[in-house]
Amino acid sequence: MSRRFARAALALAALSTPGRASADAPEGSMRWVQTGGVPFPAGVKSVLITRDDQPLAREPRGDAARRGSALGGVALPVYGVRPGGVGCPGRWLLVGPQAWLCQNQAQLSAGEPLAPGGWPPRPPDGLPFRYYFVGKGGTQAYARVEFADDAAPERELEPGFALAIVEERTKGGQSYGRSRRGLWVPMRDLLPARATSFRGEAVEGDKLDVAFTYLDKTPVYPRPEPSARPTAAPLKRLRSLRVLEETGRGGGVYYRVGEGEWVRAADVRRPLKAPPPADALPGEKWVDVELATQTLVAYEGPRPVYATLVSTGRGAQGTDTATPRGVHRVWVKLVSSTMDNLEDEDAASHYAIEDVPYVQFFAKAVGFHGTFWHDGFGRVRSHGCVNLSPLDAQWLFDFTGPRLPAGWTGVLPTEFEPGVLVRVR
């Protein structure tokens, strides 16, 4: 399995200690002092991140393990300071929960920090960026928009390459888009990606009574009998159903999904309720992936709260393209990550995608992520990862721990906020 990580994730380290507020600082201010009593500049309310995916450390040390990463251009709050040292000639700034940044890696600011929920965005289609595919003629990417079509390109992008466009400018009557990786591409060579509107269902109560269609046309029967003929109106693919009644056994099980409307259990995907893993604490959140039904259910303790369809790895257990069974924990969460040798059987036409959205790795390079290049959920399809619709990936990203603070692009767990439990069965 070949993937390139957008950010390096390091081993967990010891917990850091926050700074101490100045005794004479007014309530609600951001005025802090160092442990040694050296005052922090008055009036500073935030720190402006000057590079994208700026690493944040677990401790105020140059060799500390990674805690997460921050988005370039955002203002993060300053909660405390520590003296600099080896690897940091200035002060260490506490900019989030157990998250330290050397002062010379950012700019002090009197402006207000980014408000909670200010980033990443939450668009209605579930995609944090605007995504495009390179058309069949390929295209060229340039380091600066001034060079576009007038100088040697930085890269050649083949058909099927996908990228996130975060800015557009016009030059000579032509429109050019800047990718999140800083390259400028002619918009005339790009085709917009269209995300599916499919999303899972919230589960009410303790009963897991939801099912999903995954066939192009799911037959509906007037009664639960093998001799019954289907009605004239089959159900379309990727539709949520409430199971009102179940009857039959073996291969002849039927679900009633409406008045006089029955579907065969073999024609739909219905997740089975499962007890929490043995490692789960009482009431702890966890996620269940059922390979047989290609479904995912999010739980709080024994109670299911959300269910949806997924696409898992198509390989046999033990191979590189399988979604590995067992109990895991999410070890890093990334708003986006670049992947090649794509998580899909159509890798020949889509060989690489930049900024795949809402990635949560739980078994080395296997994890959850949003998928906008196919909508074949409910079927085995990927090269190992658990593919979700963008809306489901966004929901799951918000549901699981560790929480991503506003303005961060990635976060690693801590002792106080471990990664969510994931069981694949």
Describe these PLM feature segments.
Residues 230-234, 239, 244-327:
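Cell wall/extracellular polymer interaction/catalysis modules
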Residues 24-44, 91-139, 178-213, 256-285:
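Boundary regions of SH3-family modules and the immediately adjacent low-complexity/disordered segments
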Residues 31, 67-108, 154-190, 234-267:
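SH3/SH3-like beta-barrel superfamily modules
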Residues 279-282, 306-309, 318-325, 332-425:
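Exported/periplasmic cell-wall-interacting domains
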Residues 60-65, 146-152, 224-231, 408-409:
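Short alpha-helix capping/helix-loop boundary micro-motifs
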Residues 1-8:
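Bacterial N-terminal signal peptides that target proteins for export
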Residues 44, 51-53, 90-92, 174, ...:
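Extracytoplasmic
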